[in-house]
Amino acid sequence: MWGRVRRRYAAGPGRHPASAATLEEPGFTWPLRLTGQTPAGTEVTLRPLTLADGPAFQSVRRANAAWLEPWDATSPDPDAPSRTFAELVEQYDADARAGRALPFAVEVEGRFVGQLSVSSIVLGSFRSCSVGYWVSRSVAGRLVIPTSLAVTADHLFGTLGLHRIEVNIRPENTASLAVMRKLGFREEGLRPHYLHIAGAWRDHLSFALTVEDLGGETFTNRLRRLAGAGAETRAAQSSQQSLPRHTERGPASGGGAHLPF
């Protein structure tokens, strides 16, 4: 399990004339802690994964195995050894200190619920990175990952000075595709056989967001604006429902968050 989680964030663009970030770069710091709130006010924290997270990590992964495994990266080498949790934490820390990644644990109100990892960080003329994430089903639909992504993007663009964020998603992962589109990520096309997922090389749709796409707005403000617009739309739809008779179905329920992740 540990090896599969680690490899999930290993792939990314590497063919551009650029250089990796380092701890000497302005704004690049590790360990790093980022905090934010979902539009509903839930506290979300991004921080380094530590050895103390081992029991919670294992518990969450085990409880969500059936939900996560269709999207988990695997090794094309069936004999590749899995990493221990300690080795995973050590590799994450080494990658972060080398400026290659920002591998965050995601907490909701102090409880470990998943990971968001920034990988393939390059500067120079490219100034780009890739982002991957997973989250417990127990917090799906509460805008935990969109909030985590927004807080991280504001740090990457505003503090680290990156220009482009890329996210690659399997075409079958309709929930994540919907999130990318609602958040305004630009779909850049299909990457055939891009990552080894669930035992085979799988196609991925590539999405990207650049500083220009935000139009001077922070990502956090964009998320709050979109969430507010969704609430207004649902309220308007509800108010337009005619008064139900006994033989009619009543107004539709809210059905969860407007952004389905």
Regions found by a protein language model. Give the residues of each.
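Acyl-donor (CoA/ACP) binding surface of acyl/acetyltransferases
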Residues: 1-56, 60-67, 103-261
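Generic, well-ordered alpha-helical segments
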Residues: 49, 60, 77-84, 98
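Short amphipathic alpha-helical segments enriched in hydrophobics
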Residues: 61-65, 72, 96
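Solvent-exposed, charged/polar functional surfaces in cytosolic regulatory/catalytic domains
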Residues: 67, 87, 91, 95, ...
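Conserved GNAT-fold acetyl-CoA-binding loop/helix
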Residues: 69-90
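A short helix-loop-beta-strand connector motif used in the catalytic cores of GNAT acetyltransferases and
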Residues: 77, 90-105
